[in-house]
């Protein structure tokens, strides 16, 4: 077996049972990975320097194909209502078949960290059969110093072989696509999908499993902090496509990270060393920081259509998918934190993409309301972020990230509420979805409105304004905010048909109440009392 690059020879691929490989390319950096990806025909070069790859039929995650080994160690630890399972014997067969499939292949390996806090990070080694996948995960996770590689010993191992086709009968999975996790052996197997996001979310799922036991709250959120001496940090919870990346990229604040973080007794820390931003309809004017990364060498663009002659990207072209993405190192953002860490947050923002158009653009939540809405996780799945999803769909994704939460939501909810109370955190619910009507009749909330409201929330001025009680949801909504049309703050005023608004709001309230029944036995009375009411209450 030929080896290229630096690694700890005492902990090579044989340790995980990968033998008879043609070659392993270890810890290659962007220039070499560009060469390999282009030589193999895996990707194209865009004008500006980004590497552009397509993922075939899988243009989003495949959550229904994700399974966890179910055994004595996980039986009472995993939320099985939300996680698929396979037996230990089925996983053993799958692993052996992965090893057999890899024989004779050239693989790429990256030794990386998940977690900017050394006390709570995981050493993740990722084997891929595609060179561009190796660059993707190198961009997304935290890269060790070169001098650390010779002594690097992996804790978590991910093997990503898109050309592997699972056998549902033999392997106990749902289809030819499989994402299988064995928490005991600390192995993740990804087969049948070239969608690169599966790798980063596998690391996230692993951290979501192990960190609560150490008293650390893992979160599907972005984070930023003030540039001044206060360094006040803020968290932005939200499902993919609701605005976490866009809204945390604010030139007036320091970016901590765009997607995955932990909250420990020492403050918050990024799980990653890069960003994975949606690029569909990306605008140089609206999102200049993200746009600039698409014109840099080292960025990976996924399923972005480029002109065959000029190689200029067309960010408005959704021919391949709505879920077009770019992956780049965090230091491509000028105001990004060099450490990936910050103090305890002063504000938490829960982003919801309201597909019905009846929720206000911003509301202030009490501690009980915050836990209610965190466990509810109301939003819309945005087209393209999951395979087969072509239009926004109202959904409840608990913890604003149900596909990545292996434990019961109450584990994360109780951690969050305790940390919020301990550190006196203000919580805001922000609707980045529709206003003036639902999908098809209304319009998306203007990003300038959202940014203005967030600015007021984060600088403390919004908390000092006058609030009214929302007649359906009960939370506090500002009456007036400088720079924002008063009508927008009251959703009913943006609808032409007031009766249709009342009917739609009541329908959504009913959905909230039905969804929360599964959590009622896991929360206190004040959280149960925070749920919306079926009939409007006095404002």
Curated annotation (Swiss-Prot):
Any Pfam family: PEPCK_ATP
Organism: Methylorubrum populi (strain ATCC BAA-705 / NCIMB 13946 / BJ001)
Needed cofactors: Mn(2+)
Function summary: Involved in the gluconeogenesis. Catalyzes the conversion of oxaloacetate (OAA) to phosphoenolpyruvate (PEP) through direct phosphoryl transfer between the nucleoside triphosphate and OAA.
Protein name as it appears in the record: Phosphoenolpyruvate carboxykinase (ATP)
Residue numbers binding substrate: 61, 195, 201, 325
GO function terms (MF aspect): ATP binding; metal ion binding; phosphoenolpyruvate carboxykinase (ATP) activity
EC numbers on record: 4.1.1.49
Catalytic reaction equation(s): oxaloacetate + ATP = phosphoenolpyruvate + ADP + CO2
Class of the enzyme per the UniProt entry, highest EC level: lyase
Subcellular location: Cytoplasm
Family the UniProt entry places it in: Belongs to the phosphoenolpyruvate carboxykinase (ATP) family.
Chain sites annotated for binding ATP: 201, 220, 238-246, 287, 325, 450
GO biological process, one term: gluconeogenesis
UniProt pathway annotation: Carbohydrate biosynthesis; gluconeogenesis
